Amino acid sequence: MRAYCVFCNIVAGNEPANIVYEDDEVIVIQNILRWVPVMLLAMTKAHTTQTELWEEHIEKVGKIAHKVGAELCPGGYRLLSNFGYDAMQSQEHGHLHILGGTFLGHYVG
């Protein structure tokens, strides 16, 4: 756990969050941003970078993100990640965005 990491603090129960899914290794929470009706974040409970998430944990996190997306957005959903400043990655803790609940068009935001 990183004391400065908001996601680590959510996992530890030190910060509030609307938890959509949780197991021993993965958590899915509602994003505080509400650009579309379904806007979730899927991540490992252990602190990982975005690169570590994709290189070491994407199979498990991806399967769960797909399952949650399919359940909540039967008309379709989008999974994405931002890598680095230019892509507007705002949190160091690696995570996948699950977006849906409406027609997303070519881009969101």
Where are these regions (language model features)?
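HIT superfamily nucleotide-processing domains
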Residues: 1-109
